[in-house]
Regions:
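Short beta-strands and strand-loop turn motifs
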Residues: 1-3, 35, 122
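Conserved strand-to-helix beginnings and helix N-cap segments that scaffold or border functional pockets
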Residues: 12-16, 134
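C-terminal lobe and adjacent flexible extensions of AdoMet/dcAdoMet transferase-like proteins
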Residues: 98-144
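SAM-dependent methyltransferase
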Residues: 12, 33-109
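A short glycine-rich, Lys/Arg-flanked "PGG" loop and its adjoining helix->strand segment in the class I
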Residues: 16-28
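Short histidine/acidic/glycine/proline-rich micro-motifs that form metal-
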Residues: 5-8, 40, 125-128
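A short SAM/SAH-binding and catalytic strip from SAM-dependent methyltransferases
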Residues: 1-13
Length: 144
C-alpha cells in the first residue's frame, strides 16, 4: 500500500477491515508494508499556500499552480483543500480531502486486533530510525 493510501482509511472499522483482509491472505512469513505520514512532524502546518505552492507545466503545455490550504484539524483528522490553478481557466479547481494521522501505537493496536504484529517500523524507505523528525512511518506487518 503506497502513496499514503492508509491515511484514507478514516474510520476505525475501515482499518480493522483492511487489516483483517491482509491477515487472511498473507502467506506465512510474508509481510505487508505500507507508509503513512508521521503525525509527530505535523505536516499539515505546511499546508498553506505560501509553503505548499508549486508551479508545473502539464503534458499539454498548460501551466498549472498547485497548493494546499488547511481547512481544519480535529484529533487524528486533517481536512484540506488542494487547488489547481490552470493558466487557461479563470477559477482554480478545488478538491477537498480528509486524512487520518495515526500514531505507530494506534497502528500496533489495530494490527494486534487483526492477528498481525508490527515487525519493523522505520522513518523512511532507506530505513532511518523512526523519530519525531522523520516525515514517514514505514510499517512492516506480519501475521501472528
Amino acid at each position: 500500500m503506497t502513496g499514503h493510501a492508509f491515511q484514507c482509511l478514516l474510520r476505525d472499522a475501515d482499518i480493522r477491515l483492511a487489516f483483517r483482509a491482509v491477515s487472511a491472505v498473507l502467506a506465512p512469513g510474508g509481510q505487508f508494508v505500507f507508509e503513512t505520514r508521521n503525525p509527530a512532524c505535523a505536516p499539515w502546518q505546511n499546508w498553506v499556500p505560501e509553503r505548499s505552492e508549486i508551479a508545473l507545466v502539464a503534458p499539454d503545455g498548460v501551466s498549472v499552480r498547485l497548493w494546499h490550504q488547511l481547512v481544519e484539524r480535529q484529533g487524528d483528522y486533517v481536512t484540506f483543500d488542494q487547488y489547481h490553478a490552470f493558466a487557461d481557466r479563470t477559477a482554480p479547481v478545488i478538491s477537498r480531502s480528509c486524512l487520518r494521522f495515526c500514531t505507530l501505537a494506534q497502528i500496533e493496536t489495530f494490527a494486534t486486533t487483526a492477528g498481525l504484529r508490527v515487525v519493523r517500523a522505520v522513518g523512511n524507505w532507506q530505513g532511518a530510525a523512526l523519530t519525531g523528525i522523520e516525515r514517514e512511518i514505514i510499517v512492516h506487518l506480519q501475521r501472528v
